[in-house]
Amino acid sequence: MTDPIADMLTRLRNAVSAKLTRVDIPASRLKADIARILQDEGYIQGFKLLDDAGQPAAPVKTLRVFLKYGPHGERIITGIERISRPGRRVYFGRDDVPDVLAGLGTSILTTSRGVMTGREAAKVGVGGEVLCNIW
């Protein structure tokens, strides 16, 4: 797999389209940071890091994401878009961090201070690589 972040986003997109309650994704620290941001922003209910047997453990292999839906079953995540790819990296300076849908969505950046949303990066005054947009 050449782009594990795109794989994570595709699994989330497909799971939401299929109205699943959870989705299992191969784990990494970057993916866990992205899941933390999605939880903090209210796009998912939560996530757990699991070993191969499905139990919480030290050698993490799987990231289990619990999806969130509205009171009538409507999607909370309506769109996910990968921005920076391995073949074409996209960076923004601290003054150029983009808004997603005029502030209705969230951009996720990796910066020198860690993974954060576009709003947090603009507030702190750092730029970075834009991983994805979600709305």
Enumerate the predicted regions with their spans.
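Core subunits and conserved enzymes of cellular information-processing
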Residues: M1-W135
